[in-house]
């Protein structure tokens, strides 16, 4: 095969992975920016994993040092793992009796559900419309989005979906000030569409798909609702945890007491690691659900420890500062005739436009101007790396205002 055919073949193989707006090749990167061979800069505004930014020398050194040590120890003490466990314990105020490391968020979700089933002796799991919990069989079955399930065969049994409090699209047309009518609807669904045998309810403290933020007090009411029915309360912070909201975990801002807490993505800064934290201590017979796996890989643990170190050394305060800049800009943007609403939770935001064609046009124009937000239908979404600067956010907002005025 000659070089031209080889390049064409590679393009065909990668076609499903290419964005709708093809980007030029990048030759280097730094912080939240990518650069082309001719010096053009593109600011990444949609990166949930590599939160410490590109070219982070301290992170690279921490991982390199770990690679030079024992990388896959068996039945021995691993300093990076022990340190990470202590950091997770510290970050959650010592509220959890057991911590298990996994190699992905999907694995963490499935492990948590299996553990909840074992602890309660029940089988069903309650999830939410529009939720995202992973790509594996059970975790995708638990995700409330048709794109994750339609056409892929039979789903895992025992999953019951409840309405998430998306006030903009309230199915009862009672947005705001309704006393959480969607929770009343959840009660009816549970009574009529399930065997009333739920081991747990699993919820994202804000939904990663669309950055839908529940009204204040809803999550606490949901927790009380679940516990009154004998269910465990699982908080999935795989997207929201490890600093995205300006706090290490959003459940702390809401005053929640989850039975099981999940975290991942930002935890490893691109390395494959996630965690399940259990409030209840685990007996020996519970440990089989966690047997095997590679979540406690020494290199991934070292990576996560470095994420904690940088968050504690000023990066978390930086996230809070940039989040305020973003929130102020989004509040002003809501006056634009093309904008239906803006939603945000720390450094996660969604700009909901009135129609999809406008959103597609604006997204394309922003890409050409060197900004890389995400897009889904009529929503632009922002989940930048934590090192994004106030200046980069302000430049993006200025470009967005200009494109919305044309």
Give the positions of each predicted feature.
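Conserved N-terminal phosphate-binding loop of PLP-dependent enzymes in the Aspartate aminotransferase
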Residues: 1-406
């Amino acid at each position: 095969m000659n070089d031209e055919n080889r390049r064409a073949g590679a393009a065909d193989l990668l076609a499903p992975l290419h964005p709708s707006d093809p980007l030029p090749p990048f030759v280097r990167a730094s912080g939240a920016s990518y650069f082309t061979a001719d010096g053009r800069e593109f600011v990444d505004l949609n990166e949930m994993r590599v939160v410490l930014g590109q070219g982070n020398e301290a992170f690279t050194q921490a991982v390199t040092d770990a690679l030079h040590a024992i990388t896959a120890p068996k039945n021995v003490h691993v300093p990076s793992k022990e340190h990470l466990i202590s950091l997770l314990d510290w970050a959650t105020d010592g509220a959890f009796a057991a911590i298990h490391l996994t190699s992905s968020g999907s694995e963490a979700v499935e492990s948590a559900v299996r553990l909840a089933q074992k602890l309660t002796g029940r089988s069903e799991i309650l999830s939410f419309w529009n939720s995202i919990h992973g790509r594996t069989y059970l975790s995708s079955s638990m995700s409330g989005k048709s794109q994750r399930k339609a056409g892929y065969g039979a789903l895992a049994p025992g999953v019951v979906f409840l309405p998430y409090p998306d006030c903009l699209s309230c199915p009862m047309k009672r947005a705001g000030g309704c006393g959480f009518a969607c929770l009343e609807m959840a009660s009816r669904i549970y009574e009529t569409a399930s065997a009333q045998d739920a081991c747990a309810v699993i919820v994202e403290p804000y939904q990663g798909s669309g950055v839908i933020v529940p009204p204040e007090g809803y999550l606490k009411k949901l927790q009380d609702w679940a516990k009154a029915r004998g269910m465990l309360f699982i908080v999935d912070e795989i997207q929201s945890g490890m600093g995205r909201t300006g706090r290490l975990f959003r459940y702390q801002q809401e005053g929640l007491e989850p039975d099981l807490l999940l975290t991942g993505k930002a935890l490893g800064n691109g390395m494959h690691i996630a965690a399940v934290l259990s409030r209840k201590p685990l007996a020996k017979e519970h440990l089989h659900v966690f047997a095997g796996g590679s979540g406690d890989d020494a290199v991934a643990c070292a990576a996560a420890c470095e994420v904690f170190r940088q968050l504690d050394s000023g990066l978390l305060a930086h996230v809070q500062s940039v989040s305020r800049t973003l929130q102020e800009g989004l509040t002003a943007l809501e006056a634009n005739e093309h904008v239906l609403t803006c939603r945000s939770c720390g450094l996660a935001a969604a700009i909901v436009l009135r129609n999809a064609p406008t959103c597609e046009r604006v997204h394309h124009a922003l890409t050409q101007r060197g900004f890389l937000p995400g897009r889904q239908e009529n929503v632009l979404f922002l989940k930048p790396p934590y090192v994004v600067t106030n200046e980069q956010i302000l430049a993006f907002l200025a470009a967005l205002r200009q494109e919305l005025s044309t």
